[in-house]
């Protein structure tokens, strides 16, 4: 599912950027992406960049400490340079003391009432307070994991192969194992199917290597891009009915309760 979610995130951020560029005024769009303890999906936003657009201009992951003052400094520089700025942030960004940015009363309304919310909304209030320019936050939320119309063919292929490998493991008497894919090469993209004891991965977070985050803590490296690109490759044909994406019959999941 990661490759498909990454594909949706990168595509959506590119579309948000194109929409933003229409307006000739200084603006900031903060996109909050899933990732409480690991920033892989937020890192995937880098794939939105092309020869016409550098969005997202800033990327913040939870693997490194987030500094609000440095964020405002970074943002000022980007607004001065590009006018319209797109920022990608993980929902789980924390300060140097390990406190979630979204858990602080970063801003209060004019009556002094704390406005507590997610990381994106918290930073939106901060930008309004410090810069006073047009700013909005967008919480991608559940959309990033259910956009079936924008699935990655690589992702789908690997899902089926993983399922087949799981059957082989079961037939061989293996149990409490998770199918895993071990990358052999980025280009050409090659990997091998293996398995890992569930006890080694359950309730664990596989963090982004800090070496794949730039020293200034607001972007990712070429190594990250090389890792991500193969995972979003390929398009899955989508069926449509009456102009709307049409999926499997899930009537067995849509019971009517209370009757």
Over which residues does each language-model region extend?
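Accessory alpha-helical/coil subdomains and C-terminal extensions
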Residues: 1-136
